[in-house]
Amino acid sequence: MDFASYNLNNRPHPLVNMQGHIPEETAQRVHGVFQGVLGGDQSAFSRHLRIADEDRVKQPYMAVSDWYCDFVRSGLITLSTGKVDSLNGNTATVAPGGDKIDDIAAVVVATGFDASPCLDFLPQDVLQKLNHSPRHIDLPIALAFHGTHHPEVPDLGFVGFYRSPYWGVMQMQARFLARYWSEPGENGGSSKLSVKLAEDVSIQRTLDLRDDPRCSQFPMGDYPFLMQDMAEALGLSITEPLTEGLPNLPHNGKPLNMLTPARYPDSSEAGDDSQKLREGTRSVALAGLTSPRFVARAVFRSLLGTWKLERDLVSKLPSHPTGHFSGTGRFLLRRQTSDGLRCATDGTPAAPPHDEEGEAWEYLYIEEGEFKTEGGFGFRATRRYVWRYDERRDVLSVWFVKPEDDRRADYLFHEVEFGMPGESGGGGRGGGGGGKLGKGWPAKAGHLCIDDFYNVQYDFAFQAVNLREWSVGYTVKGPKKDYTIRGTYTR
């Protein structure tokens, strides 16, 4: 997401501020960008998540979650459109419409972070000079030059005191304050810093936005513009991007030009660290654009919920009847367990790996449906697996469950090895039009079960960032087995 949002080749230069007051035309354009990234208007998850035509002229609001939309689709989160009008016992009334929500166990008041209590230590006269207004939660004070200071309180500075701060901007704010306080002579001369301060209208802009009904979600300014404007004031030049090996992107014919704080080193001593960080950015971008890296994570995230499953079994031996299975496959998210993982040296189970947020996840997969043979005989069938994703190795794996407890993993079935589209029958990246199988990301695996070998082939077709349909096929050969299975999963 950051690669798309902060690709400097996506915008004309010099950059202008895209935040603040949002005209209807700008709102429609940004809504279009969001819809393109998501692959639709979100109605596939719920009618309550759909962005209606009349809402496209309103300023967009963005929230990022791996699981929310599919929790809604699966019914684990139930939505109601409106605002809570009253709460009586365990029943809430929603306005407009008067709909009732029953059996409420707890209420989370999601009013947002209120920064005003953080300013309680300041004297009242200072708060007045800062135009402090507790009722304006997003803009509680009005500061000069991108939220750094107020000229009437010259010995007070702010770093990161704005809605949704980014490290790069906070670093620039700290650099600015160091220059502003250590070289006061520049503040009234003809230097770049002096010119920027003379042209600055940040205080009045903040006051104007406080009651603006078209104020953006992040009113102070967008990240690339703030970095550019503060760097110009400090006389910092952006370093050239490292693009060796990066392909030109199809929408503009240019390589990825990713903005990172490392592109604004402020001394020769920082040059080596800057080079290492920029090379790291290039390496990640190269892997993401030219290899299957991160596809396993995208697949894992998008499996959540219930899928329709149609599967054909074709057997060459009478011991395994040919037939068709029709049913569902449910991926139930839970914290990752240690069952089946490699044991520690002292014999105790190894702790499950954790992702960057301190949690690791897995799915309990439950398949249920009816199998009908060619002869017309039918019976109910079910099976279970545990699906896991290893963040450190970027590997998706499937595990058998214990016979005595089918909620727990037993031992490894296979690890999924992804290829590039076009390999093993894949024909495309499974983007906006990628619905047909064989047009997505191919993957393969293998498993030897005593004398029987399972050759596994996957195909994952995405629509933008969401998995739209996928298939898995098994070719099983052994002394007493010779059959193929092909199953297709759709929402």
Language-model regions, residue ranges each:
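Glycine-rich loop(s) and the adjacent beta-strand/alpha-helix scaffold that form part
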Residues: 1-2, 120-160, 191
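Rossmann-like dinucleotide-binding core of oxidoreductases
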Residues: 1-46, 53-58, 62, 77-79, ...
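Flavin (FAD/FMN)-binding glycine-rich loop and adjacent Rossmann-like elements that form
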Residues: 2-67, 115, 236-285
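A conserved short coil-to-beta-strand element within the FAD-binding core of flavoproteins
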Residues: 76-93
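Short hydrophobic core segments
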Residues: 102-114
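C-terminal, flexible cofactor-proximal segment of oxidoreductases
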Residues: 152-294
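Soluble ligand-binding/transfer domains with enclosed cavities or grooves
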Residues: 288-491
